Amino acid sequence: MLQPKKTKFRRQQKGRAKGNAQRGNQLAFGSFGIKALETKWITGRQIEAARIAVTRYMQRQGQIWIRIFPDKPITRKPADVRMGKGKGSPEGFVAPVTPGRIIIEAEGVSYEIAKEALRLAAQKLPITTKFVVRRDYDIQNQNA
């Protein structure tokens, strides 16, 4: 499961993710990717499930990049505990995602394989996504 090796503080305030992604909103490494269309927290387990789905479908060909990392700690209080008495203990980590953020990128496979692999990955995530292709990529003249 993805999580930071070390954090400065054990707990963090919830905060609100407003607006669109200001960085990480364009393809940087691969020719294909999936882009988030809504705001949500994505857990490390969900990212790992998406990564496994892509890797299995691509049969370990090509290369993938995970562009988000769960570095925000989430706390939970135990069941049957009354309000108050402090913040709960850390339970896991999430990656806050805003619209426009590239989540996964792929390279080194054909257009059809990449589209299906990233569709399978998108099904593992709790948000709606969109398949994106690099602007200068020529679908008719694939060299992959």
Curated annotation (Swiss-Prot):
One of its GO terms (molecular function) is tRNA binding. SUPFAM superfamilies: Ribosomal protein L16p/L10e. Gene3D superfamilies: Ribosomal protein L10e/L16 (3.90.1170.10). Residues 1-22 are annotated as: Disordered. Part of the 50S ribosomal subunit. Residues 1-17 have a biased composition (Basic residues). PANTHER family: 50S/60S RIBOSOMAL PROTEIN L16 (PTHR12220), LARGE RIBOSOMAL SUBUNIT PROTEIN UL16M (PTHR12220:SF13). HAMAP family: Ribosomal_uL16 (MF_01342). Belongs to the universal ribosomal protein uL16 family. The gene is rplP. GO terms for cellular component: cytosolic large ribosomal subunit. InterPro entries: Ribosomal_uL16 (IPR047873), Ribosomal_uL16_bact-type (IPR000114), Ribosomal_uL16_CS (IPR020798), Ribosomal_uL16_dom (IPR016180), Ribosomal_uL16_sf (IPR036920). It comes from Bacteroides fragilis (strain ATCC 25285 / DSM 2151 / CCUG 4856 / JCM 11019 / LMG 10263 / NCTC 9343 / Onslow / VPI 2553 / EN-2). Coiled coil: none annotated. Keywords: Ribonucleoprotein, Ribosomal protein, RNA-binding, rRNA-binding, tRNA-binding. One of its GO terms (biological process) is translation. This is Large ribosomal subunit protein uL16. Binds 23S rRNA and is also seen to make contacts with the A and possibly P site tRNAs. Pfam families: Ribosomal_L16 (PF00252).
